[in-house]
Amino acid sequence: MTRYALAVDVGGTKMEAALVAEDGRLLPGSRSRQPTGRDATFESLDAAVVTIVEHALAALPADAELVGAGIGSAGPVDRSLGAIMPVNMPLARGFVLEEAVRAAASTVLGGDVRTVLGHDGGALALAESWLGATQGAGASLSIVVSTGVGGGFVANGAYIPGATGNAGHLGQVRREGGLTLEEIASGPASAAWAQEQGWTGATGEDLARDAAAGDPLARAAIERSAREVGEALADAATLVDLDVVAIGGGFSRVSADYIDLVQQALTASAAHEYSRRTRVVRSGLGDEGPLIGAAALVLR
């Protein structure tokens, strides 16, 4: 009998769900998404949860076992309440996401479904350590650079959630000028900065296109993001002595050399040899990483 986890990933642009087998593979046909966004409310999130959970569980084979539901969400999260406090969805702060997923899954299956909520960066870190780019590392950090910036730590194969489940939330570290890293380096923040300089595009996708075509403002925005991420990672590497950092998320693919730019900034900024040796690599799991990580919360 194949064992599956229901995986749910909630971010500032979309939420997704899929069934993930105990070997980390997504079940074909089980994956779907619904929009979230800055205007997301308790009601809109609850409706989206029901839609994606029903779609995923409709694909569950009759002879399979569902071991539980794992959720990775934009944070901070409050694991004691099963609630989320997402910076990039202000109207959704306090939404009890864990119960929403449990209720939706239990309604479909006719019985209680064990459900675990985690921070999305921590879930990704667990996935990368299990099946991705940080396998075998003694100490690793995995981050997402997308609508937001999040991260999570793994040491010797064990996810380190911290006291409240929010360890690794790199995007909320304040940088020069009082802004958080997320407010400087995320996709939307980078596009907004470029617009302030006179660029006429609107999105991270526009930045990628225009930079590839030689637009200096678009390129400057990408370099600014990578530099800020690299400098923040230098601080993290100095603090916790990292072997490797894996970077995923849509904006990390804004240019072919984004990871190289981050590595250069980390190496230039780190104060000591042990932190300068930290390697920066691209996520080994692509856009499936957050879902695999959410599943790992109940499979691992």
Feature roles, as predicted:
Residues T2, L6, A18-E22, G29-S32, ...:
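Glycine/GP-enriched mid-protein hinge/lid loop-to-helix segment characteristic of carbohydrate kinases
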Residues D9, A17, I71, S190, ...:
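Residue-level signal for inorganic ion chemistry
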Residues S73, V145-T147, V244, G249-G250:
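Short secondary-structure boundary segments
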Residues T2-S73:
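Conserved phosphate-binding loops in N-terminal lobes of ATP-dependent enzymes
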